[in-house]
Protein backbone atom coordinates (compact mmCIF):
# COMPACT_ATOMS: atom_id res chain seq x y z
CA UNK A 1 0.00 0.00 0.00
CA UNK A 2 2.90 2.30 0.71
CA UNK A 3 4.58 1.32 -2.52
CA UNK A 4 4.24 3.05 -5.84
CA UNK A 5 2.65 0.72 -8.38
CA UNK A 6 2.96 1.52 -12.08
CA UNK A 7 1.56 -0.84 -14.71
CA UNK A 8 1.31 -3.60 -12.10
CA UNK A 9 4.90 -3.33 -10.89
CA UNK A 10 5.62 -2.11 -7.34
CA UNK A 11 8.49 0.27 -6.58
CA UNK A 12 9.89 1.15 -3.16
CA UNK A 13 11.08 4.60 -4.26
CA UNK A 14 8.72 7.38 -5.25
CA UNK A 15 11.57 9.40 -6.72
CA UNK A 16 12.19 9.00 -10.44
CA UNK A 17 15.32 10.58 -11.88
CA UNK A 18 16.78 11.60 -15.20
CA UNK A 19 20.30 11.02 -16.48
CA UNK A 20 20.92 14.29 -18.36
CA UNK A 21 23.33 17.14 -17.60
CA UNK A 22 25.79 15.20 -15.45
CA UNK A 23 29.56 15.64 -15.71
CA UNK A 24 30.13 11.99 -16.60
CA UNK A 25 28.55 8.54 -16.20
CA UNK A 26 30.29 8.00 -12.85
CA UNK A 27 28.60 11.08 -11.41
CA UNK A 28 25.29 10.02 -12.98
CA UNK A 29 25.50 6.63 -11.30
CA UNK A 30 26.60 8.04 -7.93
CA UNK A 31 23.69 10.49 -7.89
CA UNK A 32 21.18 7.82 -8.86
CA UNK A 33 22.48 5.51 -6.15
CA UNK A 34 22.19 8.32 -3.56
CA UNK A 35 18.65 9.10 -4.74
CA UNK A 36 17.47 5.52 -4.26
CA UNK A 37 15.53 5.84 -7.53
CA UNK A 38 14.54 2.64 -9.30
CA UNK A 39 13.03 4.24 -12.41
CA UNK A 40 15.56 6.16 -14.47
CA UNK A 41 14.84 8.13 -17.65
CA UNK A 42 17.05 8.16 -20.74
CA UNK A 43 16.83 9.94 -24.09
CA UNK A 44 17.10 8.25 -27.51
CA UNK A 45 19.50 9.82 -30.00
CA UNK A 46 21.29 9.03 -33.24
CA UNK A 47 24.71 7.41 -32.88
CA UNK A 48 27.64 9.54 -34.03
CA UNK A 49 28.60 7.69 -37.20
CA UNK A 50 32.34 7.71 -37.79
CA UNK A 51 33.24 8.63 -34.21
CA UNK A 52 34.93 6.23 -31.83
CA UNK A 53 32.40 3.41 -31.43
CA UNK A 54 34.14 2.10 -28.32
CA UNK A 55 33.00 5.03 -26.16
CA UNK A 56 31.20 4.02 -22.96
CA UNK A 57 27.44 3.61 -23.16
CA UNK A 58 25.00 5.06 -20.62
CA UNK A 59 23.31 1.68 -20.27
CA UNK A 60 26.62 0.19 -19.07
CA UNK A 61 26.56 2.67 -16.16
CA UNK A 62 22.80 2.24 -15.59
CA UNK A 63 22.17 -1.39 -16.56
CA UNK A 64 18.58 -2.39 -17.35
CA UNK A 65 19.15 -5.43 -15.12
CA UNK A 66 19.37 -3.11 -12.09
CA UNK A 67 17.06 -0.22 -13.01
CA UNK A 68 13.75 0.26 -14.75
CA UNK A 69 14.80 2.28 -17.78
CA UNK A 70 12.26 4.85 -18.89
CA UNK A 71 13.04 6.04 -22.44
CA UNK A 72 11.68 9.50 -23.19
CA UNK A 73 10.72 11.45 -26.30
CA UNK A 74 12.41 14.69 -25.26
CA UNK A 75 12.91 16.96 -28.25
CA UNK A 76 9.92 15.60 -30.19
CA UNK A 77 7.40 18.18 -31.41
CA UNK A 78 4.96 15.90 -33.21
CA UNK A 79 3.05 12.76 -32.27
CA UNK A 80 4.65 10.93 -35.21
CA UNK A 81 8.21 11.69 -34.09
CA UNK A 82 7.41 10.67 -30.52
CA UNK A 83 5.85 7.37 -31.59
CA UNK A 84 8.79 6.60 -33.90
CA UNK A 85 11.27 7.37 -31.14
CA UNK A 86 9.53 5.05 -28.69
CA UNK A 87 9.32 2.21 -31.21
CA UNK A 88 13.11 2.49 -31.52
CA UNK A 89 13.40 2.65 -27.72
CA UNK A 90 11.37 -0.51 -27.31
CA UNK A 91 13.60 -2.29 -29.80
CA UNK A 92 16.69 -0.93 -28.01
CA UNK A 93 15.42 -2.21 -24.65
CA UNK A 94 14.45 -5.70 -25.85
CA UNK A 95 10.70 -5.12 -25.96
CA UNK A 96 10.39 -3.24 -22.65
CA UNK A 97 7.03 -1.43 -23.00
CA UNK A 98 7.28 1.25 -20.27
CA UNK A 99 8.01 4.68 -21.71
CA UNK A 100 7.79 8.40 -21.03
CA UNK A 101 5.86 10.32 -23.66
CA UNK A 102 6.47 14.02 -24.03
CA UNK A 103 5.53 16.07 -27.06
CA UNK A 104 6.78 19.60 -26.78
CA UNK A 105 5.11 22.68 -28.18
CA UNK A 106 7.60 25.51 -27.83
CA UNK A 107 11.40 25.35 -27.67
CA UNK A 108 11.68 28.32 -25.32
CA UNK A 109 9.33 27.11 -22.57
CA UNK A 110 9.15 23.37 -23.40
CA UNK A 111 5.46 23.43 -22.61
CA UNK A 112 3.73 20.27 -23.86
CA UNK A 113 1.70 20.28 -27.07
CA UNK A 114 -1.38 18.61 -25.61
CA UNK A 115 -3.29 17.78 -28.84
CA UNK A 116 -0.18 15.97 -30.18
CA UNK A 117 0.43 14.37 -26.77
CA UNK A 118 -3.12 12.96 -26.69
CA UNK A 119 -2.75 11.70 -30.27
CA UNK A 120 0.57 9.98 -29.57
CA UNK A 121 -0.78 8.45 -26.35
CA UNK A 122 -3.67 6.84 -28.24
CA UNK A 123 -1.33 5.28 -30.80
CA UNK A 124 1.17 4.07 -28.21
CA UNK A 125 -1.46 2.51 -25.94
CA UNK A 126 -2.92 0.67 -28.96
CA UNK A 127 0.58 -0.63 -29.78
CA UNK A 128 0.97 -2.07 -26.28
CA UNK A 129 3.20 0.58 -24.73
CA UNK A 130 2.82 1.40 -21.04
CA UNK A 131 2.74 5.16 -21.30
CA UNK A 132 3.80 7.56 -18.55
CA UNK A 133 2.96 10.97 -19.94
CA UNK A 134 4.40 14.43 -19.33
CA UNK A 135 1.57 16.92 -19.64
CA UNK A 136 0.12 20.28 -18.70
CA UNK A 137 -1.37 20.61 -15.21
CA UNK A 138 -4.85 20.72 -16.74
CA UNK A 139 -7.25 18.45 -14.82
CA UNK A 140 -9.42 17.80 -17.88
CA UNK A 141 -6.60 16.74 -20.18
CA UNK A 142 -4.98 14.71 -17.39
CA UNK A 143 -8.24 12.77 -17.10
CA UNK A 144 -8.33 12.30 -20.88
CA UNK A 145 -4.84 10.78 -20.78
CA UNK A 146 -5.93 8.42 -18.00
CA UNK A 147 -8.99 7.39 -20.02
CA UNK A 148 -6.84 6.70 -23.09
CA UNK A 149 -5.00 4.16 -20.94
CA UNK A 150 -1.81 5.87 -19.80
CA UNK A 151 -0.33 4.07 -16.78
CA UNK A 152 0.80 7.29 -15.08
CA UNK A 153 -0.01 10.93 -15.69
CA UNK A 154 2.83 13.37 -15.08
CA UNK A 155 1.85 17.05 -14.96
CA UNK A 156 4.56 19.67 -14.78
CA UNK A 157 5.07 21.56 -11.51
CA UNK A 158 6.71 24.39 -13.46
CA UNK A 159 8.77 24.62 -16.66
CA UNK A 160 11.30 21.86 -17.44
CA UNK A 161 14.68 22.73 -15.95
CA UNK A 162 13.40 25.93 -14.35
CA UNK A 163 13.66 24.95 -10.67
CA UNK A 164 10.66 27.18 -9.97
CA UNK A 165 8.92 24.60 -7.79
CA UNK A 166 5.19 23.92 -7.49
CA UNK A 167 3.58 26.96 -9.09
CA UNK A 168 -0.01 25.73 -9.09
CA UNK A 169 -0.67 23.40 -6.16
CA UNK A 170 -4.44 23.81 -6.56
CA UNK A 171 -4.45 22.35 -10.04
CA UNK A 172 -2.31 19.46 -8.83
CA UNK A 173 -4.82 18.79 -6.05
CA UNK A 174 -7.68 18.74 -8.54
CA UNK A 175 -5.75 16.30 -10.72
CA UNK A 176 -4.78 14.05 -7.80
CA UNK A 177 -8.26 13.97 -6.27
CA UNK A 178 -9.76 12.93 -9.60
CA UNK A 179 -7.19 10.33 -10.66
CA UNK A 180 -7.27 6.55 -10.74
CA UNK A 181 -3.67 6.17 -12.00
CA UNK A 182 -0.49 7.44 -10.31
CA UNK A 183 0.06 11.19 -10.62
CA UNK A 184 3.75 12.00 -10.77
CA UNK A 185 4.99 15.58 -10.81
CA UNK A 186 7.41 15.84 -13.70
CA UNK A 187 9.54 18.94 -14.15
CA UNK A 188 10.11 22.16 -12.24
CA UNK A 189 11.29 20.91 -8.87
CA UNK A 190 14.27 22.97 -7.65
CA UNK A 191 15.11 21.72 -4.19
CA UNK A 192 14.10 19.12 -1.61
CA UNK A 193 11.26 21.18 -0.10
CA UNK A 194 9.61 21.38 -3.56
CA UNK A 195 9.60 17.59 -3.72
CA UNK A 196 8.18 17.45 -0.20
CA UNK A 197 5.37 19.85 -1.11
CA UNK A 198 4.49 17.75 -4.15
CA UNK A 199 4.28 14.64 -2.00
CA UNK A 200 2.31 16.42 0.75
CA UNK A 201 -0.25 17.37 -1.86
CA UNK A 202 -0.75 13.65 -2.45
CA UNK A 203 1.30 13.08 -5.58
CA UNK A 204 2.36 9.46 -6.01
CA UNK A 205 5.89 10.39 -7.03
CA UNK A 206 8.18 13.04 -8.46
CA UNK A 207 10.37 12.85 -11.56
CA UNK A 208 13.34 15.21 -11.68
CA UNK A 209 16.66 15.70 -13.42
CA UNK A 210 18.10 19.21 -13.36
CA UNK A 211 17.45 19.85 -9.66
CA UNK A 212 19.93 17.07 -8.88
CA UNK A 213 22.31 17.31 -11.85
CA UNK A 214 22.75 21.08 -11.59
CA UNK A 215 23.09 21.24 -7.81
CA UNK A 216 26.62 22.23 -6.75
CA UNK A 217 26.89 18.78 -5.18
CA UNK A 218 24.60 16.48 -7.19
CA UNK A 219 25.15 13.40 -5.03
CA UNK A 220 24.27 15.28 -1.82
CA UNK A 221 21.20 16.82 -3.48
CA UNK A 222 20.12 13.36 -4.64
CA UNK A 223 20.23 12.22 -1.03
CA UNK A 224 18.29 15.32 0.06
CA UNK A 225 15.64 14.64 -2.59
CA UNK A 226 15.24 11.07 -1.36
CA UNK A 227 14.56 12.35 2.15
CA UNK A 228 12.31 15.16 0.91
CA UNK A 229 10.16 12.65 -0.98
CA UNK A 230 9.96 10.33 2.02
CA UNK A 231 9.12 13.16 4.42
CA UNK A 232 6.39 14.48 2.14
CA UNK A 233 4.87 11.05 1.66
CA UNK A 234 4.81 10.34 5.39
CA UNK A 235 3.30 13.76 6.11
CA UNK A 236 0.61 13.12 3.49
CA UNK A 237 -0.22 9.72 5.00
CA UNK A 238 -0.13 11.10 8.55
CA UNK A 239 -2.62 13.83 7.63
CA UNK A 240 -1.68 17.34 8.59
CA UNK A 241 -3.45 19.21 11.37
CA UNK A 242 -6.13 21.71 10.45
CA UNK A 243 -4.96 25.25 9.83
CA UNK A 244 -6.24 27.78 12.40
CA UNK A 245 -6.08 31.21 10.90
CA UNK A 246 -7.44 33.34 13.76
CA UNK A 247 -6.53 31.67 17.06
CA UNK A 248 -3.52 30.15 18.73
CA UNK A 249 -3.76 26.89 20.68
CA UNK A 250 -1.07 26.31 23.34
CA UNK A 251 0.80 23.03 23.29
CA UNK A 252 1.39 23.08 27.06
CA UNK A 253 -1.27 22.64 29.79
CA UNK A 254 -3.16 25.81 30.69
CA UNK A 255 -3.73 24.68 34.33
CA UNK A 256 -1.28 24.06 37.17
CA UNK A 257 0.79 27.13 36.53
CA UNK A 258 2.73 28.32 39.61
CA UNK A 259 1.28 31.26 41.49
CA UNK A 260 -2.26 30.54 40.30
CA UNK B 1 28.42 0.76 -54.81
CA UNK B 2 25.71 0.97 -52.20
CA UNK B 3 24.48 4.41 -51.16
CA UNK B 4 22.75 4.51 -47.79
CA UNK B 5 21.44 7.47 -45.84
CA UNK B 6 22.41 6.80 -42.24
CA UNK B 7 21.32 9.20 -39.51
CA UNK B 8 20.73 11.87 -42.12
CA UNK B 9 24.07 11.49 -43.97
CA UNK B 10 24.67 9.68 -47.25
CA UNK B 11 27.43 7.09 -47.04
CA UNK B 12 28.84 4.79 -49.68
CA UNK B 13 29.64 1.13 -49.19
CA UNK B 14 31.56 -0.97 -51.72
CA UNK B 15 29.37 -4.07 -51.72
CA UNK B 16 26.00 -5.52 -50.74
CA UNK B 17 25.27 -5.45 -47.01
CA UNK B 18 22.86 -6.87 -44.50
CA UNK B 19 21.99 -4.87 -41.37
CA UNK B 20 24.40 -7.10 -39.45
CA UNK B 21 27.13 -6.31 -42.00
CA UNK B 22 26.48 -2.59 -41.69
CA UNK B 23 26.59 -2.72 -37.89
CA UNK B 24 29.91 -4.52 -38.14
CA UNK B 25 31.35 -1.95 -40.56
CA UNK B 26 30.31 0.90 -38.26
CA UNK B 27 31.94 -0.79 -35.26
CA UNK B 28 28.66 -1.31 -33.38
CA UNK B 29 28.75 -5.10 -33.05
CA UNK B 30 27.73 -6.02 -29.50
CA UNK B 31 26.62 -2.45 -28.72
CA UNK B 32 23.15 -1.64 -27.46
CA UNK B 33 21.63 0.08 -30.51
CA UNK B 34 18.34 -0.02 -32.42
CA UNK B 35 17.85 0.26 -36.17
CA UNK B 36 15.02 1.72 -38.20
CA UNK B 37 14.96 1.21 -41.98
CA UNK B 38 12.74 3.39 -44.14
CA UNK B 39 10.55 4.20 -41.16
CA UNK B 40 10.18 0.61 -39.92
CA UNK B 41 11.99 -1.04 -37.01
CA UNK B 42 14.37 -3.83 -38.01
CA UNK B 43 14.21 -6.22 -35.03
CA UNK B 44 17.53 -7.67 -33.84
CA UNK B 45 16.31 -11.12 -34.86
CA UNK B 46 16.14 -9.92 -38.50
CA UNK B 47 19.46 -8.03 -38.71
CA UNK B 48 21.27 -10.95 -40.30
CA UNK B 49 18.61 -11.57 -42.95
CA UNK B 50 17.70 -7.97 -43.84
CA UNK B 51 19.48 -7.04 -47.06
CA UNK B 52 19.99 -3.30 -47.53
CA UNK B 53 19.10 -1.62 -50.83
CA UNK B 54 20.50 1.51 -52.46
CA UNK B 55 18.74 4.62 -51.19
CA UNK B 56 17.65 3.02 -47.91
CA UNK B 57 17.20 5.52 -45.10
CA UNK B 58 18.46 4.22 -41.79
CA UNK B 59 18.30 5.54 -38.27
CA UNK B 60 20.64 4.00 -35.72
CA UNK B 61 20.04 5.10 -32.16
CA UNK B 62 21.44 4.67 -28.69
CA UNK B 63 20.35 5.65 -25.18
CA UNK B 64 21.89 8.90 -23.89
CA UNK B 65 21.47 10.99 -20.77
CA UNK B 66 18.13 12.74 -20.56
CA UNK B 67 15.21 13.58 -18.32
Predicted features, each with a name:
Chain B
Residues 1-66:
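Ubiquitin-like/PB1-type beta-grasp interaction modules and other compact soluble beta-rich domains
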